[in-house]
Amino acid sequence: MRSKFKDEHPFEKRKAEAERIRQKYSDRIPPSPHSPASRLIGGAPRPPVITADLVSTVEDSAPLTKAFAVQVICEKVEKSDIATIDKKKYLVPADLTVGQFVYVIRKRIKLSPEKAIFIFVDEVLPPTAALMSSIYEEHKDEDGFLYITYSGENTFGGFETA
């Protein structure tokens, strides 16, 4: 699935934007995935405090609750009937789980508890317990962003009947 953000912005512009964000928030984003500072992410786990404000949008000036963050572009699957999220670019704490990120997305789009939401990375449902930092390292785009799509339906999976 092609990202609408990728379609609207050429690679050079996306890469420059990722670098601008990295520099602006250098205290929150490690400079390199192999830097000594980035290895601190896997330290002793702290109990997460989950609130709708746990994830900062790029425009927010409020500090993050975690030491490092990953850059995420989050978009609705084009034909999904679920609400559209207000912002696309996020700095997500690296030690946040996928399940916690889904909770934040649910809150931002004001999705009622009885409605389902599915998120996809490269058209695959990531494990709920996976850390956002590990998903980022495995699936980040060459421009520096992790592209996540969400839908009200499991559009890429399901059961086939014979």
Curated annotation (Swiss-Prot):
GO terms for cellular component: autophagosome membrane; cytoplasmic vesicle. The keyword Transmembrane helix does not apply. Keywords: Autophagy, Cytoplasmic vesicle, Lipoprotein, Membrane, Vacuole. Residues 1-42 are annotated as: Disordered. A lipid is attached at G157 (Phosphatidylethanolamine amidated glycine). Pfam families: ATG8. It is found in: Cytoplasmic vesicle, Autophagosome membrane; Vacuole membrane. The record marks G157, G158 as: Cleavage. Residues 158-162 form a propeptide. Residues 1-27 have a biased composition (Basic and acidic residues). Belongs to the ATG8 family. This is Autophagy-related protein 8. The gene is ATG8.
